[in-house]
């Protein structure tokens, strides 16, 4: 317990330092208590799905992350460092895989690929999975996924300039949405 608190504090300190140097908004590492009590007073686990758009990229057909994008990918790993992830999904593009790399290395979890052309099928697949999940997508898929999991209509992501949304969708044991939170990282 003490070690996790100390890790969270040091994670916050390094995140604050990096944010001050980069002049970006500060989002602290997220630590989740994944239990909820249902109406029968039985404890059941919630599932948390984190959804982000890939970080900043170079131009081109299948570009890699820019230097700013690489920093944002590291920031994402810091933000999620206090939360155990069971699965990480990306599309089969350099920019999404590179955004998830620091997280998969830090969490020692494998990366799985999904097809962004069939978000309905992927959403249904997510609902069959257990544990906490990170999904790295695109400006035209991230909000669709959030809505597909039960959230209200989302404001579209500004394609050229918006890379900092972190949606946190919490589902109960019956796979019903409990809450949706939008953070900036």
Predicted features, each with a name:
Residues 132-134:
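Short SAM/SAH-binding signature in class I
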Residues 136-138:
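Short beta-strand segments
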Residues 20-22:
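Boundary at the C-terminal end of the N-terminal hydrophobic targeting segment
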Residues 24-126, 130, 142-185:
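Active-site-proximal alpha-helix that buttresses catalytic centers in soluble enzyme cores
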Residues 1-12:
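Bacterial N-terminal signal peptides that target proteins for export
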């Amino acid at each position: 317990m003490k070690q996790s608190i100390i890790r969270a504090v040091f994670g916050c300190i390094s995140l604050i330092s990096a944010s001050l140097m980069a002049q970006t908004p500060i989002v602290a590492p997220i630590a989740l208590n994944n239990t909820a009590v249902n109406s029968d007073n039985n404890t059941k686990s919630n599932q948390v799905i984190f959804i982000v758009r890939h970080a900043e990229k170079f131009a081109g057909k299948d570009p890699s992350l820019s230097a700013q994008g690489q920093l944002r990918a590291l920031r994402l790993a810091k933000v999620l460092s206090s939360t155990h992830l069971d699965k990480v999904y990306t599309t089969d593009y350099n920019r999404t895989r590179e955004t998830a790399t620091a997280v998969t290395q830090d969490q020692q979890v494998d990366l799985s690929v999904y097809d962004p052309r069939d978000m309905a099928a992927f959403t249904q697949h997510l609902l069959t999975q257990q544990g906490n999940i990170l999904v790295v997508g695109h400006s035209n898929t991230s909000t669709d996924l959030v809505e597909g999991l039960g959230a209200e209509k989302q404001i579209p992501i500004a394609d050229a300039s918006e890379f900092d949304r972190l949606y946190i969708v919490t589902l109960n044991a019956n796979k019903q949405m409990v809450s949706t939170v939008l953070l900036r990282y």
